[in-house]
Amino acid sequence: VREPTFFDRNHPGWLRYTLTDVFRLSQYLGIPFFPPNPDPIVQDMATRTIATDQPYIYRITRMGQAAARKGKSLAFCDEVSQLIWGGTANWHEGDHLKHAAERAGLDLAELDAIAASDAEALDAELAANQEALEMAGHWGVPTLVFQGEPFFGQDRIGLAIWRMEQAGLKERG
């Protein structure tokens, strides 16, 4: 959605390999991982075309940014991503998101209200985050940046921590 031509620019086999690799990695790490139901990004997987109407992704990204304003974006994203990718069918219905928000120390009704009433500002903040990501030297997620040095991918989190420790940072207790 951030990059509508993403799939057009990649090798046709990229998505198949990536999904194979992600499932393999989840098994290796012992992390539950299932195809999202529904996928937060509505798209035709056969043609790799991203739909114009996106009923899920804008809501959850705006709520994630609203959570960031409260200093709880990582907790919110962790809980919601476990719903989406952890096998919860119809994660967007019922109380699934409500309970995920509560586990993150947030109120879903409040996040939804902010996402609806302040959508333009939230979208601008998300666009600024995208610009900052590119200015840091990368374009994908997840990317961590420490002292101007980008670390792309979950497999680089340990490397980013190592670099922070080199700079004298200590883990908070």
Show the residue positions of the predicted features:
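Structural alpha/beta surface segment adjacent to cysteine/selenocysteine redox centers
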Residues: 1-84
